[in-house]
Amino acid sequence: IYTDRTTEANMRKEEEKPDTIHQLLDFLKTHYDFRRNIIMDRLEYLDFNEKTEKWIGKLRPVRATSYNAIFLELQLAGIKCSLDYVKAIVNSSYPREFNPFTDYIEKLKPWDGVTDYIGQLAETVQTEDQEFWKKSFRKWFVGMLACALQDEAVNHLVIILYSEQGKGKSTWIRRLLPPEWREYYRNGMANPENKDHQLMLSTHLIINMEEFDGARISDLAGLKRTITQESVTERKVYDMQTLSFIRRASFIASTNNRLCLQDIGGNRRFLPSSVISMDYRTPVNYEGIYAQAYALLNGGYQYWYEGEEIDELNRHNEMHRMKDPVEENLLVYFRKPEPEDTCVKWMPAAAILSKIAIYGKIQVNRQAIQTLVLSLEKYRFRTRRNAQGSTEYEVVDLQNDEVNKGFGK
């Protein structure tokens, strides 16, 4: 019997009356458990009659084949509806919302208030400055949990683990997350110009920058912006409009280069530690470390640096900073005056750079001038304005014998 498309559509609508909705919902409730993972922004389901061993009792992402399988079961059960109708019901407000981070934390037993589980985990890494490492790791770890649980919180700190290859840095880092959260871990740098990388700030908990060795100065400038980024504004492939997503990711890095920092202006976001040894085989007490971190967070623990702590951090980070030749040569050929000095000069940055360029074989350009000015400010050389309005710096211009004496000759 021939029927036109209009007739077929009307017949389908007739089949999909409200009774069909109730039949379908009853069937879904008795055969499946659906939830919407708000971190990954995806539907997940559990089939109560699952036959595949790896998925028995476990939820998994809803795929196109999942809809097809559900549609087939509905037809076999005598519930007549279209595949699009099934998709519309499943991908609606029907599934419960699920946050894997709050779900895990809320099921933990409260911390006993005594046992330092985070400190015990930190002790599995032995460093050249153990006190700095333990303090910085505690701050970063609590900040990581804050970033995961609190919509307004942002972890501005980046742990950097330095050692030669083969110490197990990446393995140790990967084990910071419990098995339930392993899919929220990622290896790789975060490119602020890459939309997918930006979205990962919302869908991942730890981003391990294993390629930190190869980061250029321009890369680090973009990385600093990303580290402090509060939210992600992008349009996903299947969305019709640009949306704002909560930032949840925290950064950690591993490097084989001791001098891994480059910014002369300060590196207070970075927490570098020189690793002597790592124990990545002892089981991690996930319940303990996360219950303690949650208690510290709720108790108002300060997981960021401020005031004198920042000054101490910057002094520590100097041991891991690659100094620019302009900065190093400034301290070779000039110094700050002492009260008893009589041969004091007031010189503009360009004049200072001219001498450095001659003796230090440094190219004179805008970048060199900028680096020199930053260096003069960093070491707090006194300044004044001359009659022409240019800035001059108070220096002692070292003579050859003084320069050679500085080299130990």
Tell where the protein language model's regions lie, with residue ranges:
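Conserved AAA+/SF3 P-loop NTPase catalytic/coupling segment centered on the Walker-B
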Residues: 204-228, 261-266
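Long, low-complexity, charged/polar intrinsically disordered regions in eukaryotic proteins
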Residues: 282-317
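DNA transaction DNA-binding modules
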Residues: 304-409
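AAA+/SF3 P-loop NTPase mechanochemical coupling elements
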Residues: 196-202, 236-254
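Conserved catalytic/switch belt of AAA+ P-loop NTPases
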Residues: 220-243
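A short helix-turn-beta junction within AAA+ P-loop NTPase domains corresponding to the substrate/partner-engaging
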Residues: 261-280
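N-terminal nucleic-acid engagement/recognition segments and initiation subdomains in replication
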Residues: 1-116, 131, 360-363, 394-409
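P-loop NTPase catalytic core of nucleic-acid-dependent motor ATPases
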Residues: 92-202
